[in-house]
């Protein structure tokens, strides 16, 4: 059968895999964003702490995704847990780096003005610094999401959810009549999801970033 016939015959399974793939990436991005922004908030005032945070999260990205998942399997088993841990760790670097850069880039005069009207440090952070640092943080989230879309496909190695299962099934059956269709379906599905997520981030940016500070 040709590719379109294959999509029609497998559309329910493909939609299920696509939903699981998108859900895994979304949930891991939420966790990575919370952790990454927290690390940025804790470390941005100190040069050495910021460098340490960036270096540590950069080091994680040097570990091949298959190796990372392989190391996690004996600890947390197969399925969702190694997928969630690996994706969350891989998603940290762009968020941590951009959170630090964004917070350090806030105009000190604005912080001084907030202090002058009686704002406490936590209030300054929440009401002045984080909103002004939001554009680079959102950019970091977008970059992380695009990275995780591809890395999530490797989760099929650990029986994880997502479109990677379709790709791995095709690779395992190379030479069969549907092998290429399986690989193409999984790959194109991931590309479509990545584009949809990026479009959503553009919309979020339009809605949450004041026009005066848009980059």
Predicted regions and their residues:
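Periplasmic/extracellular loop-to-transmembrane helix junction in inner-membrane transport proteins
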Residues: 1-29, 169-180
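Short cytoplasmic-facing helical segments at TM-TM junctions of multi-pass membrane proteins
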Residues: 98, 102-137
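Transmembrane alpha-helices
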Residues: 26, 89, 121-154, 201
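Generic alpha-helical transmembrane segments of integral inner-membrane proteins
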Residues: 22, 26, 30-38, 42, ...
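Non-cytoplasmic
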Residues: 87, 140-195, 199
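Cytoplasmic-entry segments and transmembrane alpha-helices of multi-pass inner-membrane transporters
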Residues: 39-72, 87, 97-105
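Loop-to-helix entry region at the N-terminal start of transmembrane alpha-helices
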Residues: 16-24, 73-94, 182-186
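C-terminal transmembrane helix and the adjacent membrane-cytosol boundary/short C-terminal tail
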Residues: 101-104, 108, 184-215
